[in-house]
Curated annotation (Swiss-Prot):
Biased composition (Low complexity): 503-514
Residue ranges of the TM segments: 28-48, 102-122, 182-202, 283-303
GO cellular component: gap junction; plasma membrane
Pfam families the UniProt entry points to: Innexin
Residue numbers spanned by region Disordered: 488-514, 527-559
Domain of life of the organism encoding this protein: Eukaryota
Stated name of the protein: Innexin-10
Protein family membership: Belongs to the pannexin family.
Subcellular location: Cell membrane; Cell junction, Gap junction
Topology of the protein relative to the lipid bilayer: Multi-pass membrane protein
Main location: membrane
Organism: Caenorhabditis elegans
Biased composition (Polar residues): 528-559
Keywords: Cell junction, Cell membrane, Gap junction, Ion channel, Ion transport, Membrane, Transmembrane, Transmembrane helix, Transport
Amino acid sequence: MVLAAVLSMLRYVGGSDDRDFVDRLHSYFTCNLLIGLAVLVSFKQFGGKPVECLVPDIFSSSWEQYAENYCWASDTYYVPTNEPVAGLQSDEKRQRKISYYQWVPFFLLLEAACFRLPSLLWKYLAGHSGIKINEIVKLSSDPNNIKPDIKRANIKSLTVHLQGALRFHRRLQKKQIRPHRFLWLFNLPYSAFFVTAMYLCTKFFYLANVCLQLMFMNRFLETDKYKWYGMGALVDLLNGTTWEQSGMFPRVSLCDFDVRVMGNMQEHTIQCVLVINIFNEKIFILLWFWYLALLVFTFGSFFYWLLVSLWRHLNVRFIIRHLEMSDIAFDSSEDGAQEKVNRFISNYLKSDGVFVIRMMTLQSGVIFGTDLVQELWRNFHGSEPQLKRSNSAPKIEEREQWWPAYPSLVNPINPWRYRDENQANALRWRRALGANVDNSIATQDLMEKLLPQNAHMRPSDDELLNRQPIAVQASYIDDESDGKLKNEEKQNQQNATQPPYCYTNQNPTPYQNQNQIQNQNQYSNYYRTPSLSRGTDSRPVSTATDTDQTKKQSMSTFK
């Protein structure tokens, strides 16, 4: 009954899928091994006779039981058979004392708790992040994934969950939001490196724990003769040294106790057999060499995860291998292929996303990890234009905006570069967005969220053909070309029929300078002021009542 109750408790220290094989050696295998050994030793200590003593003939059975219980509760000491016992002093007996055998079960249970603690810490910290790593790995390890429909549904669910969690990190990073302004350490759960950092800390705790356990074992056994108990025991075994000579885990020890007889104190020294030390010797030799092997495995695992977490090139190669094995037409030898993967990791997956894919690949296999990377890659390229615009869209000033800018905003040295760089970026963004407008629901929702209420929609092609050409047109390149502005005459001629993109506020900021007002009037004479309502024809076009002289003045002003 007791054994069944103890074994039923092992489900609370069961293994988890959100760790690698070395972690399970610590938190599952070693922990359960120590609990089992503690139960075995406890049965011998508390269920049998751990010590049996040789008492004088004058002792009755009750005195014999008393002597054995006293020697078990107090400490015995060891004296080799070739040394006299009568001449030993109290201090010398205290140095030879053996006091660890009573505490072996409790020491083993304490070690089991130490091996389990880093796993509980990892589970707690990982649960406070937006990425539920334990649930993700469980879903990827679902046995029903052999069914295609269930596998596709699980991959879709994982993709949606990762997208939501990673989008939250990108939003905080973009807006530079710090939930805790003073205690910056509490902002780590909101970063895109939190799960990876916590796993590396857990690995370090595993490594530190196994090193401390080796030191505690030497301290607990009081092996002053050996600096490292296991190596000393191995040397004694190879040299044929027995416990009688070494004194390690002695089977026979001595015990002193006093008996009050008729008011007089009688001192007795009896010889006892420590049967429990036969088990203790084998247990601690096994544990010492197991800890040594575990130390080697843990160091290698910690170094591996540290390397793949900090060295970006390994993450790029990891994603490239999965893309090459997927159904996507991806060739790593093409120009720009590695740059695409870099952008995929930097702008989309981040460190935690790559970590989750690695962990799922370890638990579920390469095929499932490849399918997940394929789905994430397709979603990234499907949302990359919207993602780029939402991440790089600047703030639009609440004032009247035109393209080209008013003459007061034009650099007199270089007419094609604005004095106000923020306005130039805003106008460039407006023009780039207008080229990607379609009638889909997703685009319309994006326009509603990103465009201000006073921005005008792009006109249709028929409306563009009815427009009068614009004489001056500047061509812009995107942000990936270092924000440079170019003026190409050939491109201007091709785009001459395309009107500028502009928008206006209902309450434009008045111009204080008299020259600015005059230039504004000249500009307005040539270009009709756009309407303020959305959805109407709001493009500034040339009017029929303008004179040639007014056109020439306005054009010379722009140049």
